[in-house]
Regions:
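Acidic (Asp/Glu-rich) sequence patches and key acidic residues
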Residues: 1-115, 120-122
């Protein structure tokens, strides 16, 4: 039990049932905090509404995420039991290479006209 995070893309915005995520994270609370902030900014909904929901990422989001990853200034998560926030600095270091790969992949997907989606479940 805990925070599971996923990212995938859609061609032409079409939902493909059973599609496998391209990226998976487990208890990466700083990434979750970043995504929750984006979700609230874009939708006006509470961050908790992202649970089992979807967040479309755009090039501005990805540029900010890339900057934060490169400069080790991801937002601190107040977390919760399920987020693994007690280990968020360790998770940030552990996932750094994967996070960079995610941003590079997501930018390519957007350049090809696809939609990049982030989701989570706890």
């Amino acid at each position: 039990m805990g925070l599971d995070q996923y990212a995938w893309s859609r061609e032409n915005g079409e939902v493909v049932e059973g599609a496998e995520p391209q990226f998976v994270w487990r208890k990466h609370s700083k990434l979750q905090e970043f995504m929750e902030q984006k979700f609230t900014e874009k939708t006006g909904l509470e961050a908790g509404e992202l649970n089992c929901g979807e967040l479309e990422l755009d090039s501005v989001d990805l540029a900010e995420l890339e900057h934060r990853i490169e400069n080790k200034c991801m937002p601190i998560s107040p977390g919760g039991f399920f987020y693994g926030h007690q280990f968020q600095d360790e998770a940030e270091d552990e996932y750094r290479d994967q996070d960079i790969m995610f941003v590079e992949w997501a930018k390519r997907e957007l350049a090809e006209g696809n939609t990049v989606i982030y989701s989570c479940w706890w």
